[in-house]
């Protein structure tokens, strides 16, 4: 009888764990979402310190079409700011230069007619 009772207790514990598992998944997803939002706010705060309003506006507009490029640039700017390598604020002109340096060079193809 003890074995049967032990099996029942084990099965009951498994069922209770399965029922609480969706709650744990939802809670973990919520925590990840909160952590991501906090990181985004920290990045925005750093960018406010190192960029002029015009440059931030350009970056915001560019995010709509080139999200990966903007995220890469933001991470580099945050890293430079944290290391103290930015002496002046990034203005719109400096941002344009940085963006052109980050974009891969396109091949020029020319068609010649014979």
UniProtKB/Swiss-Prot annotation:
GO terms for cellular component: cytosol. One of its GO terms (molecular function) is DNA binding. Keywords: DNA-binding. The keyword Ribosomal protein does not apply. Transmembrane segments: none annotated. Residues 16-35 have a biased composition (Low complexity). Residues 14-37 are annotated as: Disordered. HAMAP family: dsDNA_bind (MF_00026). NCBIfam families: PRK04239.1. Belongs to the PDCD5 family. This is DNA-binding protein Mbur_0117. It comes from Methanococcoides burtonii (strain DSM 6242 / NBRC 107633 / OCM 468 / ACE-M).
């Amino acid at each position: 009888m003890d074995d049967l009772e032990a099996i029942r207790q084990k099965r009951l514990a498994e069922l209770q764990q399965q029922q609480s598992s969706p709650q744990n998944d939802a809670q973990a997803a919520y925590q990840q979402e909160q952590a991501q939002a906090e990181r985004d706010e920290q990045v925005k705060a750093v960018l406010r310190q190192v960029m002029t309003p015009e440059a931030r506006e350009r970056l915001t507009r560019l995010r709509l079409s080139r999200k990966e490029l903007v995220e890469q640039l933001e991470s580099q700017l945050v890293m430079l700011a944290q290391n103290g390598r930015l002496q002046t604020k990034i203005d719109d002109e400096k941002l344009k230069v940085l963006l052109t340096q980050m974009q891969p060079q396109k091949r020029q193809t020319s068609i010649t007619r014979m």
